[in-house]
Amino acid sequence: MRNVTILAACLFTASVSAAESNGEYIARISDCVACHTAEGGAAMAGGKKFPTPVGDIYSTNITPDKAQGIGNYSYEDFEKAVRQGIAKDGHPLYPAMPYPSYAKLSDEDVQALYRYFMHDVTPSAQPNKENAIPWLLSARWPLHIWNWLFTDAPATTVDSAKPDDNAALVKRGAYLVEGPGHCGSCHTPRGMAMNEKAYTHADAEYLSGAMIDGWYAPSLRGSGMSE
């Protein structure tokens, strides 16, 4: 009986380690560190400035620190922030956070991501910075309407791909590009409401090239890429 208990504990530990490893993989693909790390600041501790048409937005601390970060987030809180753009206290996040793309993340990948942030990311008490947005433009309630218009229902599962299954590999690639990779955030043109005009390769505008912060993100749809 003791041996069975030890074996079960080892298998559980191995599964947890695998989940956290996959969580780091998803975090890297999602490029969380690029937006949530300020120059000279702690990794994932936020504070990076993003100029927008309505003012400057600062990324938040997403380390597991309980005072400044997300250490008090349950999995349900985390999932809602990542895939629906809703913070723990219920306020909508600005879509500078690419949650319309992250809505495509599977339950399994979001769970792995949560484990990684809670167990492997180093906590930092670096304070969050206030956004520099004029008062009249700082109301968050219009973002609920924006979400209703421009986001999809969260995904739940995603098919795995075998090395010899080309169709499955293409599907897996689409998942990585459209979901965690959020390639469309830069390479898809935006509408009047700053929404991406498409979120899937089925739409011709998806990854068709766009201007962003004064530079041009070229089309990734294949035409001319080999030239």
Feature locations, PLM:
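Sequence context of c-type cytochrome heme-c attachment sites
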Residues: 37, 42-68, 96-100, 149-159, ...
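Electron-transfer interface patches adjacent to heme c in soluble/periplasmic c-type cytochromes
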Residues: 52-79, 100-110, 201-227
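A cross-kingdom feature marking solvent-exposed beta-strand/loop segments within repeated
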Residues: 89-105
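Gram-negative bacterial Sec-dependent N-terminal signal peptides
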Residues: 1-17
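Extended, well-folded interaction surfaces typified by the phenylalanyl-tRNA synthetase beta subunit core
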Residues: 125-143
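Periplasmic/extracellular electron-transfer cofactor-ligation site
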Residues: 24-56, 84-92, 120-125, 178-213
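Electrostatic cytochrome c docking/interface patches
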Residues: 13-28, 147-178
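Conserved hydrophobic/aromatic "anchor" residues
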Residues: 27, 78-81, 116
